[in-house]
Amino acid sequence: MMDSPKKLGYHMPAEYEPHHGTLMIWPIRPGSWPFQGKAAKRAFTQIIETIAEGERVYLLVEQAYLSEAQSYLGDKVVYLDIPTNDAWARDTGPTILVNDKGKKLAVDWAFNAWGGTYDGLYQDYEEDDQVASRFAEALERPVYDAKPFVLEGGAIHSDGQGTILVTESCLLSPGRNPNLTKEEIENTLLESLGAEKVIWLPYGIYQDETNEHVDNVVAFVGPAEVVLAWTDDENDPQYAMSKADLELLEQETDAKGCHFTIHKLPIPAVRQVVTEEDLPGYIYEEGEEERYAGERLAASYVNFYIANKAVLVPQFEDVNDQVALDILSKCFPDRKVVGIPARDILLGGGNIHCITQQIPE
């Protein structure tokens, strides 16, 4: 048993620190990406092309789909033939840590499709559970095996200076690590991520089927500086959830003892829902969670991705699209802030941050 990453001097950098590259997965799952994923593939392509302007993109695509992916992307990416069950690189890819000598260590968490037998979203996730170790092997990076601890990359945010953000709704969900206490879960995070402090937010985004990942509700934009998904509509269930998160953040400090600057990022003014027109496009396997007409989707501008040269922000053809871009442009003056039409990713159950995973420099 190797020492914990913390004992070995590794830590998880912030997403806004320099990247070597980004990991993504080609979207092919028929129960996630309707109508053969055609619209999703166009959205993924726009995201990949934007990220690739400033860093390498590694794309996991099985041999059977390689020529299709190449028809969209040509030689813009590094293709790796690693099998997956779906395209959520944030949640199935490794969490890559660094030490002060610039060495990397890939953390391999257990993955159970956001809840396993309790409330997981599909039953066969065996390939997904191998993605982190197989990708690390392809990159020739050493692996820290954190299994059987269940965690997804979307459930954690790091400031690179010892602070980790999580939500209680996700990490304490009975479908993750039901036999561990909150204290044991926190200790595992600190040791595995080389961190000093975990901040437990009560909630994420309403009806987020990941049990409310933190990456949809709060994100670091700099040291001691965060954005928080917000609504002023007191009749929206999201209002009480965001308010509880705000109250906690206002009284908390980061690992260095600094209070947070908090920017409120509005959620879309119009609720994003699954329509009757979307439904015929999905093909489900047995035991897979199915969509229904009118289902509210967990749309949030906080699910942006910070690449080396750009910040990629979901857009929903909503009045708040530009508001979100303006706020984030002030947070990231040195990067191009790019709006990406994202409803076709949202229909799969996540957004831009959920399909990307940074590989630190």
From Swiss-Prot:
> Which keywords appear in this protein's UniProt record, sorted alphabetically?
Hydrolase
Task: List all membrane-crossing ranges.
Answer: none
Q: Which GO terms describe its biological process?
A: putrescine biosynthetic process
Q: Note whether Cytoplasm occurs among the keywords.
A: no
Residues annotated as the enzyme's active site: C354
Pfam families, per the entry? PAD_porph (PF04371)
Q: What class of enzyme is it?
A: hydrolase
EC number(s) given by UniProt = 3.5.3.12
Which reaction equations make up its catalytic activity? agmatine + H2O = N-carbamoylputrescine + NH4(+)
Top-level taxon of origin:
Bacteria
Q: Which GO terms describe its molecular function?
A: agmatine deiminase activity; protein-arginine deiminase activity
Family affiliation? Belongs to the agmatine deiminase family.
**Protein name listed in UniProt:** Putative agmatine deiminase
Organism, as annotated: Streptococcus pneumoniae serotype 2 (strain D39 / NCTC 7466)
Taxonomic lineage from the root: Bacteria, Bacillati, Bacillota, Bacilli, Lactobacillales
Encoding gene per record = aguA
